[in-house]
Amino acid sequence: MQTRKTGVRAQQADRTRDNILKAAVKVFSKEGFTGGRIEQISTLAKSNDRMIYYYFGSKEKLFISVLEHIYASFNQAEAKLRLDLADPEQALRELVAFIWDYYVRHPEFVTILATENLHQGLHARKSQNLRALSGEAVGVLRPIIEAGQAKGLFRDDICITHAYLMIASLCYFYNSNRHTLSSFLAVDLADKQAKADWLTFISDLALRGLRR
């Protein structure tokens, strides 16, 4: 009986922590790190301030956990991809499409990263897990490039980091700046066709950047 009670308490604790984390993602993505308040998060999580400090220690540590959480969620979604390495060019297109679609479907990912960059990566540097998480993300691209090189399709001098930066930046910049650029360029970048055209463009661009 004691074991069952302990198991139930552990599950309740996990749910409470998860609810707080999800609420923090929503609050920080809307208000930023500076504007996001612990009271807002606890209210949204249907918890209380004391529980946030119990599980996370401080607002800063909670934000670091949020950063780790959004990257881990991205990696988990990316890990579900089933890419056919027999066709490296198509696999690359599918990876670019996944990254693009993820940014579109998860605007909180884009806004929280923008917030952290405003703070010059202060909290990211304090994370003990982000480097490992980045390795997982880049690791999905590596076998695609290696397969393309083995078939003589991709250049042998490709830097994996540069290739990943190219793809991530082409997906991220559009989504993080679409509001201002829509006004500046007098183009509705939120338009469905505009987004589809951009995905085609960046997929072609990524391939041209890697081909021999």
UniProtKB/Swiss-Prot annotation:
GO BP of this protein: catabolic process
PROSITE patterns: HTH_TETR_2
Reported phenotype of the disruption mutant: Growth in nicotinate or 6HNA is similar to that of the wild-type strain. Mutant strain shows constitutive levels of nicotinate hydroxylase activity, and these levels are similar to the induced levels detected in the wild-type strain grown in nicotinate. On the contrary, the NicX activity shows the same induction profile than that observed in the parental strain.
Keywords: Aromatic hydrocarbons catabolism, DNA-binding, Repressor, Transcription, Transcription regulation
SUPFAM superfamilies in alphabetical order: Homeodomain-like, Tetracyclin repressor-like, C-terminal domain
Transmembrane spans: none
Protein name, per record: HTH-type transcriptional repressor NicS
